[in-house]
């Protein structure tokens, strides 16, 4: 029953990859639900807290989520549904359940391209995002993005302008419109594509959800395009996820004197593929999707009308005054305009050189995790067990700490300061 899928997906203190291991061991969520407590021990990696959460058979929360889905007209896609993206099953921590609005595309039969970038994009970045979104769609690709203001939204508008569907992946409940200024875009994506979230309806857009959802954007995509990203942009998390998942990373080269291109230009230095048109991306998948990618409709950089581009440029939100300066900020005195922005876009790693300086600047949960890591390298599951925090919150907080330059990921699911 679908309620058992929701029950398993919402078990606290169990990582997504362990939930998949449970699913593989017991064949389906109903078997997991009705299993004897001792049988859970066959799944390696479960913490005592995780075992306790599996012993909790109360279905009221799952039933409420299901009722909320009916009220909000949300549909549910499970890991074992035929429409579930096969590419996503190949990552280490796929979600068991998606809540969505709209119509699902053929995830496996079409080239999905993740398009990401900063919310505070330059006019050049905004117009280029829309242009490439349009071109990708015209050539037979599907744009996947996060529905944020800036690069995400403009890429999706470009795809919709081309008459193609788009896929939006949210860091909150699928019924929520965030940011509110993108309400018209949400309506269009729902009508012509789909809006998806691993988070149940009613989940607010809290900061730690966004880094977590980035693995989905990259995981269901063949490759990820970074249009414009500053040094500590959340888009770089998506690029790292893509690289870790074996996906291609593409980058639009940017002005070396503009801070909002520092991160994306660095990806080029590290081996990402430079892009000047959609064909630089889709040509990589021509053999994989010979009947879907339309080379004869590969469009030039002028294929979106100048009027359309001008409208996109006018829609671009002005950069904060500090961000418009052609220099990198002082390490010791980060400007307030940047500090006030969303955590994943902060300038970070250069600010924290000593653990004693770190702790006062961190949230209580971040402090717990940093304290747990002070003894040296730790497995992620050990950090979860020591802190007593929910697994999903630990993973998301670790990602935020990585963006700030506080922690470093190591092979074998290990973390260190």
Regions found by a protein language model. Name each.
Residues 79-417:
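Glycine-biased, small-residue-rich flexible motifs in mid-sequence functional cores and linkers
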């Amino acid at each position: 029953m679908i309620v058992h899928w929701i029950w398993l997906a919402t078990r606290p203190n169990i990582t997504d990859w362990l939930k998949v291991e449970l699913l593989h061991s017991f064949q389906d969520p109903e078997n997991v639900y009705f299993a004897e407590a001792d049988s859970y021990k066959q799944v390696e990696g479960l913490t005592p807290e995780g075992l306790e959460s599996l012993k909790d058979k109360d279905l009221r929360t799952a039933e409420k989520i299901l009722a909320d889905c009916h009220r909000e007209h949300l549909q549910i896609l499970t890991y074992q549904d035929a429409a579930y993206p096969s590419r996503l099953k190949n990552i280490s921590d796929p979600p068991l359940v998606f809540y969505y609005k709209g119509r699902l595309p053929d995830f496996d039969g079409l080239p999905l391209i993740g398009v990401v970038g900063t919310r505070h994009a330059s006019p050049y970045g905004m117009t280029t995002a829309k242009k490439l979104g349009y071109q990708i769609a015209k050539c037979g690709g599907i744009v996947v993005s996060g529905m944020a203001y800036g690069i995400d939204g403009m890429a999706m508008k470009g795809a919709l302008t081309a008459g193609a569907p788009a896929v939006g992946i949210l860091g909150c409940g699928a019924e929520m419109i965030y940011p509110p200024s993108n309400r018209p875009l949400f309506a269009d994506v729902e009508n012509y594509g789909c809006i998806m979230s691993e988070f149940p309806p009613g989940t607010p857009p809290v900061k730690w959800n966004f880094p977590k959802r980035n693995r989905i954007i990259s995981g269901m995509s063949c490759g990820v395009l970074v249009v414009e990203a500053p040094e500590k942009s959340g888009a770089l998390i998506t690029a790292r996820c893509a690289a870790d998942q074996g996906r291609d990373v593409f980058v639009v080269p940017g002005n070396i004197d503009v801070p909002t291109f520092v991160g994306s230009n660095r990806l080029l230095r590290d081996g990402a593929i430079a892009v000047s048109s959609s064909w630089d991306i889709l040509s990589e998948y021509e053999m994989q999707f010979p009947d879907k990618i339309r080379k004869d409709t590969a469009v030039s950089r002028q294929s979106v009308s100048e009027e359309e581009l001008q409208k996109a440029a006018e829609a671009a939100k002005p950069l904060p005054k500090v961000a418009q300066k052609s220099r990198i900020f002082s390490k010791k005195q980060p400007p307030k305009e940047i500090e006030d922005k969303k955590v994943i876009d902060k300038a970070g790693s250069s600010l924290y050189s000593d653990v004693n300086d770190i702790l006062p600047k961190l949230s209580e949960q971040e402090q717990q995790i940093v304290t747990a890591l002070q003894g040296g390298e730790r497995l992620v599951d050990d950090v979860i067990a020591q802190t007593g925090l929910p697994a999903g919150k630990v993973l998301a907080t670790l990602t935020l700490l990585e963006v700030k330059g506080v922690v470093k990921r190591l092979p074998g699911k290990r973390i260190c300061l």
